[in-house]
A protein has these predicted regions:
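Short acidic loop-to-helix transition motifs that present clustered carboxylates
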Residues: 35-41
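Short glycine-biased active-site loop of nucleotidyltransferases that positions the nucleotide triphosphate
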Residues: 42-46
Length: 149
């Protein structure tokens, strides 16, 4: 199964988590692909069977600048991905009202596209974790199990 990993990061933590997720999915026998700043054309060329987004939140609950162009392009073109499995791993700081707002935007987009959320969005709180890659592993295992089910 081909899994595309979309990522958006302000300070690099979400990128690290996305790279870690790519390694974990490959170890599990999936064909995972992650590229920072990917274009919609690159994503379509990969022809994913499933989607994983790893993103932080910036500003007033917005997506980071490096994910926003892809998000906008997907919203404009609405590719035919209905029924495909997807999940979102969001990083944020719970001291803000817009905690994990970037992840919520991706969940809404996935719902608009008709993608199936196979595991509930994981919200990693930067005020509670210093090892988000490790903290994400049980959730990633659940994501892999859902994809293989």
């Amino acid at each position: 199964m081909k899994v595309a990993i979309l990522s958006g990061s302000v300070y690099g933590t979400a990128e690290e988590v996305a790279r870690h997720a790519e390694r974990q999915l490959k170890i599990a026998g999936l064909e995972a692909w992650h590229k920072s700043n990917m274009s919609l054309e690159e994503l379509l060329a990969f022809a994913p069977d499933a989607f994983l987004t790893v993103t932080s939140t910036t500003g007033m609950g917005e997506l980071p600048d490096n994910l926003l162009p892809l998000y906008s392009e997907i919203r404009d073109r609405l590719p035919a991905w209905s029924g495909k499995p997807a999940a979102v791993l969001a990083l944020g700081d719970s001291s803000y009202d817009t905690f994990c707002g970037g992840g919520e935007l991706m969940r809404e987009l996935y719902a608009e596209l008709g993608l199936r959320e196979v595991v509930e969005m994981l919200r990693l709180d930067s005020s509670e974790t210093v090892t988000p890659e490790t903290d994400a592993e049980p959730w990633l295992q659940a994501f892999v199990a859902a994809l293989k089910a």
